[in-house]
Amino acid sequence: MDKESYDYLVKIVLAGPSGTGKSCLLQRFVKNQWDDQVSHTVGIDFASRIISVGMGNQQKRIKLQIWDTAGQEKFRSVARNYYRGAAGAVLVYDVTNKDSFEELSSWLSDIRAMAPSTICVVLAGSKSDLQNQRQVSTEEAAEFCSEKHISSAHETSSYTGSNVEECFLSVVSTIITRIELGEIDPQDQSLGIQYGDLSFRRPVHPSSTSNWWTSITNWDDLVRLERQTRSYCC
């Protein structure tokens, strides 16, 4: 089997206030690297990775296309455009910064206003290795998830790698389960999922005219995003 083959292509967005570590989270997940000499994302950044979920004959290969949105207020209107057609979102706050946690409701409102109603959202508390600087408890995060109907909460460390894989796997596993239950239709590309070359491909329904690439002007833009030198923020 071609190592680049996959069953599904899934669009995920990273969202949250500036400086919470979204880009470092992406760098750790995609490249398994840590770099503390990084800068804030300007506008939008992009990366991809293929992962496997499930066991045995039920195992699926999923290609994640992950969009890292800028947290600065001046780029927020740009970030909102990329929530359209997202199958999943990782909402990031900094466990050492209470203000970043208190801003989450606003970011979540943006996601749910712009993304499909089927979007799966998980909460990621970054910088969990800085326990002596903690300002947000795990109980507060769990309560927020319960109140806002977020599927799960994860405390992550891009520095150590702790829980980074688990965070993204949680999003993907939930999405795949919902596909198998018939709650999400991969033929409807507006939901942020497409069949890959390992899946049984059925004709796309004529009514599925929406496309989750609508936030990109054309394929040249996508190639440019993939080739550009990426800047990451911790």
From Swiss-Prot:
CDD domains: Rab. A motif (Effector region) lies at residues 39-47. GO terms for cellular component: cytosol; membrane; nucleus; plasma membrane. GO terms for molecular function: GTP binding; GTPase activity. It holds the Pfam family Ras. One of its GO terms (biological process) is vacuole organization. A lipid is attached at C233, C234 (S-geranylgeranyl cysteine). Its main location: membrane. GTP binds at G16, P17, S18, G19, T20, G21, K22, S23, D68, T69, A70, G71, Q72. InterPro entries: P-loop_NTPase, Rab_GTPases_membrane_traffic, Small_GTP-bd, Small_GTPase. Keywords: Cell membrane, GTP-binding, Lipoprotein, Membrane, Nucleotide-binding, Prenylation, Protein transport, Transport. It is a lipid-anchor. Belongs to the small GTPase superfamily. Rab family. This is GTP-binding protein ypt4. It comes from Schizosaccharomyces pombe (strain 972 / ATCC 24843).
